[in-house]
């Protein structure tokens, strides 16, 4: 109380209000990075009760929407080389190239664990990823299924083993998928954005309040899928990894697999413009999230912006000692943020992010604002 009265006498109501707003936003930021994101590095899924007594057989389902020989020659072998005793790879080819499909079928001669099915592509009736996954689920021979994409690259031969172990403690398994590492500012921003936005749903999942996974690295059981009567929001081409998952996720049926050996990397097919287009496409589902989830996601960015604004205001108009105090609070916040980001990056197998994180820390809200403006316009690619 004496401190407040001293601030009030020295700097007036304006200075006291500014100090209060700065401290409040700092408190929100520290709460997020220490008590929310800070739980990610120390999380252990094996603390959850075990429901299966042995590692299950697993079907890996991969939708293939083009004649992608680079996937067949480069990324499919990494899936087939997984160090796991009993699994199959279900490839759902959506297209009309008979020669390419025959090449896929012939792969079974060398790799018996491959199961291939085809959906004929008719331009009059577009096939969504949900439809392809539905066919893959029905074609899978095993109860436990892991879903990935043709763009995702396993980093080790332990990926499938670790994901499969998750089914011993839950009907749903979620893992992390980062962005492939490259050179330049754009690649760094894309990698940092992916990691920190993944930290949102991972942090909620380790708190047993899961609301989504990533379409490149997640799984669930057949019983769960058919018990929910399949995917939801069938008028949308997206939502299989979030809107559907929100229907079936509970406090007790989600396993979170966090390990550099279980992480994937998504191959990038363009620069910043392509990436923003992807964020707009998949981000169109966000408006249908529960209000509590939207509030949780927005408060971190909002409190960061308000904290920066109060510090800038203090540096611009307040006396020297006030400026020094505001600058000290900014330094304290960044030290805490950088420390926690480094811990999270280490747990997820991300390198080269923490050292330059101040770039993303400052520019991330501007990027989020640009994406929010893009989402105000309807994306016709989303709707059927």
Question: Residue locations for each model-derived region?
Answer:
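N-terminal membrane-anchoring/stem segments of glycan-assembly enzymes
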Residues: 1-52, 341
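Acidic donor-binding segment of Leloir-type glycosyltransferases
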Residues: 76-123
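Short aromatic/hydrophobic "clamp" motif used to bind/position activated sugar donors
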Residues: 145
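Acidic donor-binding/catalytic loop of UDP-sugar-dependent glycosyltransferases
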Residues: 150-165
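Catalytic donor/gating beta->alpha subdomain of glycosyltransferases that bind UDP-sugars
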Residues: 172-197, 223-226, 231-294
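Membrane-embedded multi-pass helical conduit in multi-pass membrane proteins
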Residues: 304-380
């Amino acid at each position: 109380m004496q401190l407040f009265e001293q601030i009030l006498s020295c700097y007036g109501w304006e200075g006291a209000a500014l100090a209060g707003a700065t401290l409040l936003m700092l408190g929100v930021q520290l709460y997020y990075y220490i008590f929310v994101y800070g739980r990610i590095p120390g999380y252990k899924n094996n603390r959850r009760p075990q429901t299966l007594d042995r590692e299950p057989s697993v079907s890996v389902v991969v939708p293939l929407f083009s004649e992608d020989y680079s996937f067949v020659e480069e990324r499919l072998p990494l899936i087939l080389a997984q160090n796991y005793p009993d699994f199959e790879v279900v490839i759902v080819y959506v297209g009309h190239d008979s020669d390419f499909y025959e090449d896929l079928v012939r792969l079974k001669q060398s790799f018996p664990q491959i199961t291939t099915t085809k959906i004929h592509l008719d331009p009059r009736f577009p096939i969504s990823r949900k439809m392809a996954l539905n066919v893959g689920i029905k074609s899978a021979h095993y109860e436990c299924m892991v879903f990935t994409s043709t763009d995702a690259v396993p980093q080790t031969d332990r990926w499938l083993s670790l994901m499969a172990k998750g089914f011993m403690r839950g009907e749903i398994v979620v893992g992390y998928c980062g962005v492939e590492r490259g050179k330049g500012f754009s690649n760094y921003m894309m990698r940092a954005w992916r990691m920190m936005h993944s930290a949102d749903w991972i942090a909620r999942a380790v708190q047993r309040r899961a609301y989504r996974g990533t379409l490149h690295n997640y799984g669930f059981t057949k019983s769960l899928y058919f018990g929910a009567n399949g995917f939801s929001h069938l008028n949308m081409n997206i939502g299989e990894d979030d809107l559907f998952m929100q229907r079936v996720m509970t406090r007790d049926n989600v396993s979170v697999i966090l390990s550099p050996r279980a992480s994937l990397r998504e191959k990038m097919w363009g620069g910043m413009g392509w990436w923003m287009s992807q964020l707009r496409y998949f981000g169109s589902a966000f408006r249908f999230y529960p209000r509590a989830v939207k509030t949780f996601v927005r408060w971190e960015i909002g409190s960061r912006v308000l904290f920066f604004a109060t510090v800038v205001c203090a540096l611009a108009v307040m006396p020297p000692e006030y400026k020094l105090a505001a600058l000290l609070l900014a330094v304290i916040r960044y030290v805490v943020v950088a420390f926690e980001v480094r811990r999270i990056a280490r747990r997820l197998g991300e390198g080269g992010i923490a050292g330059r994180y101040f770039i993303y820390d400052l520019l991330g809200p501007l990027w989020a604002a640009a994406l929010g403006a893009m989402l105000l316009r309807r994306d016709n690619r989303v709707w059927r």
